[in-house]
Amino acid sequence: MQSCEISSDSTDDPLSSGLRRHHQPRIVVIGAGLAGLAATQTLLENGFTNVTVLEASDRIGGRVQSIQFGKATLELGATWIHGANGNPIYHLAEDNGLLEHTTEDERSVGRISLYAKNGVAHYQTNGGKRIPKDLVEEFSDLYNEVYELTQEFFQNGKPVGAETKNSVGIFTRDLVRKKITLDPDDSESTKKLKLSMLQQYLKVESCESSSASMDEVSLSEFGEWTEIPGAHHVIPGGFVKVVELLAQDIPSRVLHLGKPVRRIHWNYSAQDAEGDADQADHNQDQRPGPAPARVECEDGEWFLADHVVVTASLGVLKKAHETLFSPSLPLDKALSIQKLGISTTDKIFLEFSEPFWSPECNSIQFVWEDEAHLESLAYPEELWYRKICSFDVLYPPERYGHMLSGWICGDEALLMERCDDETVAEMCTELLRKFTGNQNIPKPRRILRSSWGSNPYIRGSYSFTRVGSSGGDVERLAEPLPYTKSSKAPPLQVLFAGEATHRKYYSTTHGALLSGQREANRLIELYHDLLNAETTKA
């Protein structure tokens, strides 16, 4: 696994100059993913010197995890920079020479084809037959036409019909089925193929949304997610390079790895502190006056804080918010955590000695003909493999070798995570043989897969607006505590960042980065006069 070097302490680092420490607010950042690192970097750059980062795992990066797999760098987590101009991740990568030169043709990545730059997606049935390219294109046009309609409910304020149950999946399935069924030019066999392809497209869409099913995704809110124009870029050296750039000026003493947090105590009064005289303050130094917040770690260590920036994933907050915060979160914030959605999207990488696919093939899409009329794409445990929607060919082979990347989401992804490598490799090989009709496909040389759902410090891949939730819930999740600006309650004791707290860019790396910068800027604004005064004195 690639590791990130944190800069060693030196006389010119942000902690050794600038504002005098004894005036500094104590800031604890929980989590060293993109949001936490962006918040920390922004705080240090703006003169804050008493910043501590607590990361539960043994590495930085969060849901960015680049793995060296032979000569190839594979992404278990974040893969693409979505869009160009206006995307801070893109500009960071471009300014630091992380992106390769690409042609216009190479940059035209389709919405459904997840990985490849060139070539053709092969839609294969479970009978081992390839669906003709013209039929695939015909269906794709129909699906994309309906997809555009799903955006209009939010963007144009279009009312949602009760029959859709405010569900992207139900709306899409019903309308596409209706259009297919009423088409007078198609034979019954063609209609069945298209209906089967619809189910496959919905599986892919679920992987992209990180939802167990598109039936769970809110139709009225779907169009609020904002796409930045431009291509989807892959970083050849690994997305971890972005993590390293964010972390390179963070001194090593700021960052504590392997430091899971047990509880965040906020609105901590002087009376509370009287009984805690034996609790040591392990921040870099102590600011005069009581600390309104205290962070209690699993190993028994405590950190006093004026401000705590929480970047835990929505999955972790769903699992632990009732015990993680003392006092408990306000009811409306807890309700927003409950209403918003997060599921698991996992990747399965298979390495082969030689390609069994043709040179123009950029992906193998699994179309189950017996699923044409299913209303639900949830499966019993023994059929978890049916949720694998496709295998994409990693491109170019000079970089990746002969590598396929499979996609699976929802509860079936969690079931996959529980299986051993041998079982998953065998099942994937059988699927590839079945759908290509080639019984001579060998087992892969090696397998690598993600396990975001069962990772106790992540618990899912990324968030979505579930039926019953809205952008307002994202705003409530992001709102700092305490809510009231009372003179008796110190402000901004607990701040919230992470992709799930960005109303327009949830589920993205740029949303995560921007959310961290947003919370840092709240503190910069709060201490504007102090920072200016101390900078003038320096």
Segments from the language model and where they lie:
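FAD-dinucleotide binding site
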Residues: 1-538
